[in-house]
């Protein structure tokens, strides 16, 4: 029985050691990739006392004005597992996922829509950067039809790589339609999570504004101007979880100015957007959960399996060798003859007697020791011992002393 148990434990130990070695190399990489069935997420940022451009169209009339108030921006990310399976080209299958993203900026007091956009893009499952997919698109005007391939995404957009490094990354800016470096500036604790802080500075960049969009603005704010441009600045601060590459917190200090060729500039946007507390809390909770899964499979799982495997291996070997030693000793013992006492003692040792069964010393009679042996019959022996009676003389003989 011990031999079987030992062999089973030995085999279990080997399996656990193989499992421990395979976890970080074969299983862990699967959890450090964007999943196909990722749940939709929504992040909310708020800007207090912001200045913003509001264009209202009622029939053929258009109202253009700069207002001031609180703004709320919500970004919803919806993964598309079916499109990922069916629409990606062969060179991207297995390595990228398709996401649909929608952003809406509203006034806090009236819920009126200030701006909105929608987009569809492909992201690399490991790096989180935009994948070179020809069918990506971006709709900023709210048009019903959007030309496919009207935007070329590059760099990080909604996620950083798994295992983010302390270095600069290219981060895509939707207003510029290109990626700009975001520099690593340090680490910070956010609700118990150590996050990497990156800053991207965009200063006085001239936006590519269609003439049809620029003319109404010049007519409203600079009637005497014949041309102008919109100048854009943004300081974007990103707090990234280095393990998963997820956004923990985001801040964007945006500014847009209309600068006509004559007249004064007009501020079209001056807003400081920050993730609200609920979004930060949910981001931290998600990061903690994903960190636990990654750590369990890539670190703690292999350690636990390795330790248990070694224990099972050692115990199994010990049981097998102990059983073999016992069998060897059993074979070395001399056989006991049938009918003999296996517990007999050596002749040079005192026998061990039980107190109750030990033989008691005999009391010899006064006449001498008794014996069961009968002396041989003789008529010519006599003893010098006076206590032994002499043999009576035969008839006609003289008794001799």
Q: What residues fall within each predicted segment?
A:
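Membrane-proximal extracellular "stem/stalk" segments
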Residues: 218-305, 312
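Solvent-exposed coil/turn segments that connect beta secondary-structure elements
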Residues: 49, 201-205, 255
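Acidic/Ser-Thr/Pro-Gly-rich, low-complexity N-terminal segments
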Residues: 330-401
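Short, cysteine-centered beta-strand-loop-beta hairpins and adjacent loop/turn segments enriched
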Residues: 106-112, 204-215, 257-264
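Membrane-proximal low-complexity regions enriched in glycine and acidic/polar residues
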Residues: 155-249
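Extracellular or lumenal secretory-pathway regions
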Residues: 2-163, 277-298, 319-326
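Primarily hydrophobic membrane-targeting regions of prokaryotic envelope proteins
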Residues: 245, 316-320, 401
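Juxtamembrane interface at the cytosolic side of transmembrane helices
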Residues: 2-8, 292-347
